[in-house]
């Protein structure tokens, strides 16, 4: 069964890597959301926060899975956090993939980034349960 997947990533730093990950699925029975023309993102990011949130919410519509592509500077970014929070709120499955070892357009890799799931938790039986305990992360294998 095909699932529509939203990809969350640090656009400026990891767009090339994210595109490579997306293209690895081309022959698979999957649909991807969260990939957009760079000119579109350049226009969107000029808008105010409420317009950006609306745009992200529209990208998340119809998705059931959110894959957070974790690069060196992904964790703690405002829009990554919003995408994680929104995805969890709409009960999307979440999955983290470290992409620091994937080469960028210049052939360079980067340092492993902090897991953004470590910033988020739910309360269960009066105890914090961090997203790192709820959602798996993996390393991208070239």
Label each PLM-derived region with a short phrase:
Residues 59-85, 93-103:
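Conserved beta-strand-loop-alpha-helix hinge of the TIR/SEFIR fold
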Residues 18-19, 78-81, 106-108:
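A short acidic (Asp/Glu
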Residues 88:
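Anion (oxyanion) recognition and catalysis
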Residues 1-62:
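Conserved N-terminal substructure of TIR/SEFIR domains
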Residues 50, 77-78, 115:
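Flexible, active-site-adjacent loop/turn segments at secondary-structure boundaries
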Residues 12-14, 101-104:
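Conserved nucleotide-binding/hydrolysis micro-motifs of P-loop NTPases
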Residues 4-6, 105-142:
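C-terminal interaction surface of TIR/SEFIR-family domains
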Residues 36-38, 97, 131-134:
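Conserved beta-strand termini and adjacent loop/short-helix elements that scaffold enzyme active sites
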């Amino acid at each position: 069964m095909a699932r529509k997947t939203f990809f969350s990533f640090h656009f400026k730093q990891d767009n090339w890597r994210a595109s490579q990950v997306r293209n690895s699925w081309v022959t698979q029975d999957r649909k991807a959301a969260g990939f957009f023309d760079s000119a579109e993102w350049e226009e969107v990011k000029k808008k105010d926060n409420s317009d950006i949130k609306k745009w992200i919410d529209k990208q998340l519509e119809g998705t059931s899975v959110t894959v957070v592509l974790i690069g060196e500077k992904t964790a703690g970014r405002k829009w990554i956090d919003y995408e994680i929070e929104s995805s969890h709120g709409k009960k999307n499955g979440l999955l983290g993939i470290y992409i620091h070892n994937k080469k960028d357009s210049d052939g360079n890799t980067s340092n492993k980034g902090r897991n953004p799931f470590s910033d988020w938790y739910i309360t269960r039986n009066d105890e914090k349960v961090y997203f790192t305990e709820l959602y798996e992360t993996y390393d991208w294998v070239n």
